[in-house]
Amino acid sequence: MSQIHSQIHSQANTSQTLATNLLILGAGPAGYTAAIYAARANLSPVLVTGLQPGGQLTITTEVENYPGFATAIQGPWLMEQMAQQAVHTGTRIEYDLITSVDFSHGSPFHLMGDSGTTYKARSVIIATGAQARWLGLPNEKRLQGAGVSACATCDGFFYRGKNVVVVGGGNTAVEEALYLTHHAAHVTVIHRRDKFRAEKVLQERLFNEKKISVRWNTIVEDILSAGAPPVVTGVVLRYFTKNTQHTIATDGVFIAIGHTPTTSLFQGQLELDSEGYIVIPTPRSTQTSVPGIFAAGDVQDKIYRQAVTAAGTGCMASLDAERFLSGL
């Protein structure tokens, strides 16, 4: 058991009410940063971890773009350090999952945990993140961090001079492919349709890039690997028009079919956009459509989606919550 897990409060099979100045939902960079700042402001925050403490960084083997580390660090280790710092500064961490919320009556807000605990919070920071959409292939999860990725900005550096595949046809896929040309020797875009959904200007850039080729009307049926530990060696493709299979060699597979924000719990409670992301009505703020409810990290960010930007908005949300609680 890790050191931080021994300090987490488990509320399994309990029925109690826990009151707090600030309740933070989510245990990724945004949530932990918010907790650290809130604890230092003597707000005595409570952080509810949700199902995946540590967020997406728990499945990221090497992190090279988080400031302060000259060499690559492990994603799970980084999250453990953030959690320890949050606890050290005075955060109470609850290993629980929020299953229902009621923001309709204003502060204090009432939230129910899967454990049976009722949380009563004067303010709330939502940092529940967003999950990359995956293809659902048998080897996909097993090879994450070993050649399979959903973030070119995070992992493109590891494919200098190598061949990679990008799966998808929207803005995300085209942007990922263009970014990867700065590192990879060649990028093959796999798209199940005969045209992209991406913006025209992005398509023009892609078609003018000599290091990119496109395979239309094609899906990935399997991801191949070899070695111990295994690494990606190729993909099995199926062409719709000919109903034939073909295998191509590749060093990396980038899945770029979008992200799903973890916001279903807040439908009807907060303003969400057409993709389910929490709307921040006021620029340069983290305030949601309900006063006293703030959002940080990927749950409100469909553009950057980086650990460092998530941490930054976590800091902002904590400062905004502090001002709200002070009546400023």
Predicted regions and their residues:
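Glycine/small-residue-rich loop that forms an oxyanion/phosphate-binding "nest" at active or ligand-binding sites
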Residues: I93-S115, Y119-F157
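A conserved FAD-binding loop/helix module that cradles the flavin
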Residues: V174-E176, V290, A296-L328
